[in-house]
Amino acid sequence: MAPDLTILYGAEIYYTSDVLEKLENQVIPSLNGTRYALIEFSMATPYREIHTALSNLLMLGITPVVAHIERYHELENNEKRVKELIDMGCYTQINSSSILKPKLFGDKYKFMKKRARYFLERDLVHFVASDMHNLDQRPPYMKEAYEIVSKQYGESRARELFIENPRIILADQII
């Protein structure tokens, strides 16, 4: 028997100049109608642009969840910058595939795995999510990632990243 599954409305939003207007007019969705929006940038977006974009979202009353922070070159091994984003009111997310061991997912994106570990070790991550686009090329691997986080950082931390924090924001509450 399959577990109960509830699908909630939301999207990963690639940040462009018209995102603020589209969010304000509800043309693109926040996460389940909450104050939270999952925001993605190009891997090569300069930090100043990331910071400005997130500041603009916050001024609009949208709380950004910065998608897969391990991808952004400007945040690599930069605890200060990630803390600055968190301190201004943002939350951060890493992908489950960035936690996996090479035998499960390959070694193509080793640099992302190192970055994800760096952020996890410094308690700079609020969520782990799948970034799943399809089952063939990008399966979720959530169970495998949960087990690794639980083993390396403790069951409590795994529950927080995979279960508790997502429930909190979907209820439109503050972590």
Label every PLM stretch briefly.
Residues Y14-T16, R71-L75, I99-P102, H133-Q137:
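Active-site environment of divalent metal-dependent phosphoester hydrolases
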Residues R122-P139:
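Short acidic/histidine-rich active-site segments
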Residues K101-F105, Y109, D136-P140, L170:
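Short active-site-adjacent structural elements
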Residues G89-K103:
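His/Asp/Glu-enriched short active-site or ligand-binding loop at hydrolase and phosphoryl-transfer sites
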Residues M1-Q93:
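Extended substrate/RNA-proximal surfaces in nucleic-acid metabolism proteins
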Residues H68, D131, P166:
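Conserved, mostly hydrophobic/aromatic
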Residues M142-I175:
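Mid-to-C-terminal alpha-helical segments outside catalytic/metal-binding sites
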